[in-house]
């Protein structure tokens, strides 16, 4: 029996321990610091100012485009009116028409008093 006691002394008690892994320290974030709040506020203000500026520029562009379209429409109407008036001037300035009206008014055609004017 003495052998049994001797053997137990030779082999120390083996305790099975799990390998301990170092615990990862989880950082808990508290409230934001004053510096972070200032930076976020400034960044947000810049974003809002840029967004407002973009919207206002787009509104100005829209207004200018509307004015341009209105002016172009007026120009086209005026050009059409000018063309109609040119046709009317040519029609009213015909030699036969002028001669007819002159005869109705009692005027006579005298070749010595006629001057030829080069029209445009």
Curated annotation (Swiss-Prot):
Tell me which domain of life the UniProt entry assigns to the organism this sequence originates from: Bacteria
Q: What job does this protein perform?
A: Essential cell division protein.
Protein name according to UniProt: Cell division protein FtsL
NCBIfam families the UniProt entry points to: ftsL_broad
Q: Where is the composition biased (Basic and acidic residues)?
A: 13-22
| Keyword terms, alphabetized | Cell cycle, Cell division, Cell membrane, Membrane, Transmembrane, Transmembrane helix
List the stretches on the Cytoplasmic face of the membrane.
Answer: 1-37
Extracellular face of the membrane: 59-120
Compartment annotation: Cell membrane
Q: Which family does it belong to?
A: Belongs to the FtsL family.
Got a GO cellular component term for this one? cell division site
> Chief localization class?
membrane
Membrane topology per the entry is:
Single-pass type II membrane protein
Q: Which BP terms in the Gene Ontology apply to this protein?
A: FtsZ-dependent cytokinesis
Q: What are the boundaries of the region Disordered?
A: 1-22
Database matches in Pfam families: DivIC
Q: List the disulfide bonds.
A: none
Which residues span the membrane? 38-58
Sections of the chain in a coiled coil: none
């Amino acid at each position: 029996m003495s052998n049994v006691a001797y053997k137990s002394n030779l082999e120390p008690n083996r305790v099975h321990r799990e390998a301990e892994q170092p615990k990862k320290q989880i950082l808990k974030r508290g409230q934001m610091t004053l510096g972070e709040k200032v930076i976020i506020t400034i960044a947000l203000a810049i974003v809002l100012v840029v967004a407002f500026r973009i919207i206002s520029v787009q509104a100005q562009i829209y207004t200018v485009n509307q004015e341009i379209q209105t002016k172009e429409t007026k120009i086209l109407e005026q050009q059409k009116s000018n063309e109609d008036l040119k046709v009317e001037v040519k029609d009213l300035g015909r030699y036969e028409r002028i001669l007819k009206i002159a005869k109705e008014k009692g005027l006579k055609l005298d070749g010595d008093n006629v001057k030829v004017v080069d029209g445009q």
